[in-house]
Regions:
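N-terminal intrinsically disordered/low-complexity leader segments
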Residues: 1-7, 140-147, 193
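Amphipathic alpha-helical packing segments from all-alpha helical-bundle domains
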Residues: 67, 82, 115-141, 153-156, ...
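Helix-turn-helix
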Residues: 11, 19-53, 57
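Amphipathic C-terminal alpha-helical segment
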Residues: 94, 158-176, 188-193
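Short hydrophobic clusters on alpha-helical segments that form packing/core surfaces
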Residues: 12-20, 91, 132, 162
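Amphipathic alpha-helical segments used for helix-helix packing
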Residues: 83, 96-119, 167
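Short, basic, alpha-helical segments at the C-terminal edge of helix-turn-helix-like DNA-binding modules
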Residues: 60-66
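Hydrophobic alpha-helical connector segments
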Residues: 57, 70-100, 151-158
């Protein structure tokens, strides 16, 4: 019978998530992770197997709490284009001013270029693309898109725009300009409806 965990798993995953967002996977040292989680290296390895196991758990926590939470809050089923607009605008109001960036975006860049994308990155981008497509089909013009081609193409374009916004926010781009770009994009989509 295994030992029960004697730590607050949510707090540990949140701390690790912060370090991976700040330093990336390669740049996150065990010492950084120890400080952020309050666990010693041996406890990290015992609980998660290795650094990759902790990363996977922290990334899963990020996808559940940050990504899915943001979608549920701003673009739930039935919210259509307005929900997507709100989802995009919400990116401009991060508590850390976007300085840590998005874990999904950061890891897509760090792990990119390999033969196989990281499964957590692939799943997160897939969730965004699917959410965009589903909210688009709630708009009248996309509802008439019998085979879904137009909604799929637009969802991919919005995914590229969303990820680009996250990079620009992390790079310190003027948020007023980014807000106007978001408004312009969704105003154009609404005129198509």
């Amino acid at each position: 019978m295994g030992r029960t965990r004697e730590f607050d798993e949510e707090a540990v995953l949140k701390g690790a998530m912060h370090i991976f967002r700040k330093h990336g996977y390669q740049g996150a040292s065990i010492r950084d992770l120890e400080e952020a989680t309050g666990l010693k290296g041996g406890s990290i390895y015992h609980a998660f197997g290795d650094k990759a196991g902790l990363f996977d758990a922290a990334f899963g926590h990020y996808n559940r709490t940050v990504l899915e939470g943001r979608i549920e809050r701003f673009a739930p089923p039935g919210s259509g284009l307005q929900g997507l607009r709100e989802l995009f605008l919400s990116l401009l109001h991060e508590p850390d001013n976007g300085s840590l960036g998005c874990l999904i975006t950061n890891m897509a860049v760090e792990f990119g270029g390999g033969a196989d994308p990281h499964p957590r990155v692939e799943a997160a981008l897939g969730l965004l693309r699917t959410t965009f497509r589903l909210r688009l089909t709630e708009a009248s013009i996309f509802a008439r898109d019998a085979d879904g081609t137009k909604a799929n193409r637009t969802a991919i374009r919005l995914l590229a725009f969303y990820q680009g916004l996250l990079v620009l926010i992390r790079g310190g781009e003027d948020k007023a300009g980014l807000q106007q770009a978001i408004e312009d994009e969704f105003n154009q989509l609404e005129t198509m409806s």
